Amino acid sequence: MARSKTYQMLMKISGDSSSLKKACEAASEHLDTLGNAAKAAGKVAATALAGIGTAAAGIAVAATSVYTEHEKAANSLAAATGATGKELENLQSAMETVYQNNFGESIEDAASAVSLVSRNIKGLSNQEIAGATEAAIALRDAFEYDVEESTRAAAAIRKNFGGSAEEAFGLIAAGAQNGLDYSGELIDTINEYSSQFSKLGFSADGMFQLLQSGADGTAWNLDKVGDAVKEFSIRAIDGSNTTVAAFEALGYNAATMMDTFAAGGDGANQAFFDVLNTLMDMEDQVARDALGVSLFGTMWEDLGTEAMEAMANASAGAYDTMDALEQINAIKYNDLDSAMEGVKRQAEAVLVRIGEQLAPYAKEGLEYLVNNVLPVVSSKLEEIVPVVIDAGKALWENRGTILALGSAVVTAVGAFKGLQVASAAV
């Protein structure tokens, strides 16, 4: 701190040896110390405020960026489903839930999966949509099933047998874990043959039990098991001479049997297994195969005796899903990368809320930029560009002179430095 004029005047009056001079010097030193401390404190405060400002700006930029990504995903969801108003809000909520629970490769991926679930599986609540989406993504990650295909399969199960989407996905997951996809046809078999199983009074559990029995009984293709059921469901009620003769040869009243199968339900299911077991109990293998073909078509021959016998002994109990989806989620996503991604997404949730508040101001700023700043800049550019072009042309036209002048300057500078060295040596 510079000493004051008052202090300097006192020095002149008091003289160098006076006590007043000493007192003033002591006071001045204290004032200098206080001033330096104040400056230091000011610098610290300024630095702190600058740091806070930089951090706040960084958070604002990050929040706006993340919010924009989520907004784009929501727009994609709206476009894919045609949802508006409250329905769209519910789908957006499901999308955010799925993403926050660490399912999907990105928020866009979560939006795409939610839209497929919404379109393919009707009548789900917001919570059920989120759960079904997470299940579909888990099946994709574990077994490489497309979300579109697995949701169609789950929808087929619900349509033909009832039950929740969660139960349907649980059956698919358990079936895959139990090897039902050995021929790569589990999803297609469910989609194509669920309605045929339903006609014969099967439940969803019963269908999976029969598929499992056929697969365990050396059926070389899962599709063949489904096709055998389809053929029987058609022939059992077609009233053809072949069907009538087959039922009568097995000891049944053909008309009664056809009425039973036409009615569906538990009676049809019980009759199906009764006919199948009667066939398997026949000692004459040639006659059995002939009647089997009459009722099951060529699928009887394709599947073979061992597979058909296994199907006849299929369990009537519930298909054990073993909490397959929970196991997949517990194992598949239980690693450091998944944990870190989960933390990142939790942080994103906070940034989205901040970005939502900042977005209107950012949009206003962009509108102002477009409407007020850019037109001015554009008009000025029209004035500046010709001048720059003329200057460039002048430089190019006189490039020889400029290069020669530059060379002369370099030579002169070199000579001057040489003279400096020589002078220093002398």
Show which residues each predicted segment covers.
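Acidic helix/loop microenvironments that form the catalytic cleft of cell-wall polysaccharide enzymes
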Residues: I157, E192-K199, G214, K230-S233, ...
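Cys/His-dense Zn2+-coordinating finger/ribbon modules
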Residues: T278
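Alpha-helical coiled-coil/heptad-repeat oligomerization segments
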Residues: L171-A174, E192, L210-Q212, A228
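A short, structural motif
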Residues: A2-K5, G15-G170, A174-D188, F197-D205, ...
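Hydrophobic, low-dielectric interface segments
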Residues: A41, I52-A60, S183, D216-G226, ...
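Short, low-complexity N-terminal tether/leader segments at secretion or assembly junctions of large
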Residues: M1-K21, E231, F296, W300, ...
